[in-house]
Regions:
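Single conserved hydrophobic/aromatic residue that forms the stacking wall/gate
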Residues: 2-6, 10
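Cytosolic regulatory regions of ion transport systems
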Residues: 9-385
Length: 385
């Protein structure tokens, strides 16, 4: 009771005058107002910073990353294959710079690629031909760079502009960085090689697809073989140094790999698959092998034993004339016909059926030696046709 009476007396004596209470009330309201304004400013600043980060304009701090310049339908496939290739790396990164919204790129990769495992995918919005935008993605620290050909008219001109900005700008790309550029027209290969100064590997997409299309249509099951070799699931091609094979012939080196298959050599920047068996290997040569992983490429100099009497010699069988039906038409039709002409026997025929205008003008100028070409306009989805 004593403490209750004492505290009530103290509280009643501290009430103060009405003026004092008014000042305290105004101070409290002012404090609440200032704190509210401060919270609003902090919230607005954080939201602005997050909004700026969503725009994809911040600098990329990754090192040793794979840099993709441009956006095309092939991006999802490229990222998927790189994710598989980087499974043995702890901190792998893929950086994409394209004139697309960052959120849209992130959503597209998440939808089509899914789990990227140990690989981090970073998207940035910008033009690959703009030096300021290129600086954002740290090209000097990249392990490899892929320049994609965009959709639309004259895509090769855009690729050349990107290479000029990349190699002739203020960025110093190290020689160890492997640069791959996608080109569609064979006439533009020489300008790209001139700009690349020996540092750019040109992939002639249209010609490559045409070759694979012709070869797979002529041999059943070959598409499965190409799929096995060209993706990172299973076995694929690898280049490796093997100085211990110096002085051996290619035929002798075939038996020096236990868990991979030797298929060619790389000398002075040129790759030759299936060289002569008596070709002598040099210490600075690189071997081209088919292996499950680069860690399985190991040389074993112990000579294997086998019965040479069981080896069979094949005889060449003459190829008869063929008839090929091509349904549809696109910009690769002429390339496919030329590639087909190089494989078939004399007297072979090819019929192109497509529902396009001026088909005779489009195909009339294709120069063929062994193949007799004819065309017909019609709806390829019609059963009556």
């Amino acid at each position: 009771r004593y403490w209750r009476d004492w505290s009530s007396d103290v509280c009643s004596s501290d009430l103060g005058s009405r003026a004092y209470l008014a000042i305290m009330f105004a101070t409290t309201l002012g404090g609440i107002f200032v704190v509210s304004v401060l919270i609003g400013l902090l919230t607005s600043g954080i939201q602005d910073k997050l909004r700026e980060l969503r725009k994809g304009k911040s600098f990329v701090v990754e090192e040793g990353h794979t840099l993709i310049l441009g956006w095309s339908p092939q991006v999802n496939t490229i990222v998927s294959e790189l994710v598989i290739a980087n499974e043995s790396l702890k901190r792998a990164a893929i950086v994409i710079l394209a004139e697309q919204d960052k959120t849209a790129m992130d959503d597209a990769i998440h939808q089509h690629v899914g789990d990227t495992k140990s690989t981090r995918v970073v998207c940035r919005t910008g033009s690959p031909i703009d030096l300021a935008h290129l600086a954002i993605v740290n090209p000097e620290g990249a392990r490899s760079i892929v320049v994609l050909s965009p959709e639309g008219p004259d895509p090769d001109a855009h690729v050349i502009k990107v290479l000029l900005a990349l190699l002739n700008g203020r960025h110093k790309i190290p020689e160890r960085c492997h640069i791959v550029a996608e080109i569609r027209d064979a006439r533009n290969v020489e300008p790209v090689e001139l700009v690349g100064r020996g540092q750019v590997e040109v992939v002639l997409v249209e010609d490559l697809i045409s070759r694979i299309t012709v070869q797979t249509c002529r041999q059943s099951g070959l598409s499965v073989v190409y799929g096995e070799l060209l993706d990172f699931a299973g076995d694929e091609f690898y280049l490796a140094r093997a100085p211990e094979l110096a002085g051996k012939t290619f035929g002798e080196a075939l038996f020096c790999f236990e868990r991979c298959a030797l298929v060619g050599i790389k000398r002075d920047g040129e790759v030759e698959l299936g060289p002569d068996f008596d070709r002598v290997l040099h210490a600075d040569d690189e071997v081209v092998v088919i292996a499950e992983d680069d860690t399985t490429v190991r040389v074993d100099l112990r000579a294997p034993s086998f019965d040479e009497a069981r080896l069979c010699r094949s005889t060449r069988v003459p190829t008869p004339p063929e008839r090929t039906l091509i349904l549809g038409y696109n910009r690769r039709a002429a390339l496919i016909l030329r590639q087909l002409d190089a494989y078939v026997a004399e007297g072979s025929e090819a019929l192109v059926v497509a529902d396009v205008d001026r088909l005779d003008e489009r195909l009339g100028g294709v120069a063929l030696e062994r193949l007799s070409l004819s065309w017909r306009r019609g709806d390829t989805t019609s059963r009556a046709l």
